[in-house]
Amino acid sequence: MAASNLADNKCVPCRGGTPPLTHQQIEPLLAQLEGWQVEDDKKLIKSFKVKDWVAAVDFVNRITPVAEAEGHHPDLYVRWGEVRAYLWTHKIDGLTESDFYMAAMIDRVFAPTAGASRQAK
């Protein structure tokens, strides 16, 4: 399943007691995403480089309706020229497939503006 296919899935609300994905389950999902890293098998992280502060805020504003529609909200760190996205399922303090779906959706939102002045790191 390519990243674009991951983005075609719907995020599923996590129920308490759902186990987080194991390292073995994470690896094939991560391989479908470009530039995302996993921290301690608990969080997905990616830094997006953009032209300036306005572009950073614009990118966050374009992520917002997607996150709202999916009911799955990334933590976003904004600074001049960069937006850093953190994804994990808070209820289980780990990763679920929905985190990977949302990562692919964020990549899809970023793609139309990617270019020489706006690039993911």
Model-found features: residue ranges?
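Long, contiguous binding/interaction regions
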Residues: 1-34, 39-121
